[in-house]
Design a protein with these regions (language model features):
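Basic/aromatic-rich interaction segments and small domains that mediate binding to polyanionic partners
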Residues: 1-104, 115-125
Length: 126
């Protein structure tokens, strides 16, 4: 991810009133909803996690829209690869040949997710 000297200022302003990671995720989701226009071309530049199907590193996809956030993977998007449609965590995707504002917004989210992320969910029944 290219260094953006204003990224920390943007994230600080966006997240200033948030009390925890879940509130930060909600604030970032609102920010992304304002910045992104679908469909949006992207490339996957993060290897898949165990149990992740369909989208591999280097795959080019079209982001079709947002899905409900996931407690482990954060903001989820619906993507098309060829004729198939998949769910994919947004942090695995980088906009490709898109407007600068869209690239900046996704890079802001990816920076936050990789630095802060979401707390691990502990299942009380385990």
């Amino acid at each position: 991810m290219p260094h953006d000297p204003l990224r920390s200022e943007r994230l600080e302003a966006l997240l200033a009133d948030c009390q925890n990671e879940w509130e930060q995720l909600a604030a970032l989701e609102t920010y992304l909803e304002d910045q992104l226009e679908f469909p949006l071309r992207a490339v996957c530049d993060v290897p898949p996690e165990h149990g992740s199907y369909g989208i591999g590193e280097g795959d080019r996809v079209t982001i079709l829209g947002f899905l409900e956030p996931d407690k482990r993977w954060g903001i989820m998007v619906r993507v098309r690869k060829g004729q198939r449609v998949y769910r994919c965590p947004l942090f695995r995707l980088k906009p490709w040949k898109s407007a600068g504002a869209q690239q900046i917004a996704v890079d802001d989210y990816r920076t936050w997710f990789n630095a802060v992320g979401l707390p691990e969910i502990v299942d009380p029944e385990e």
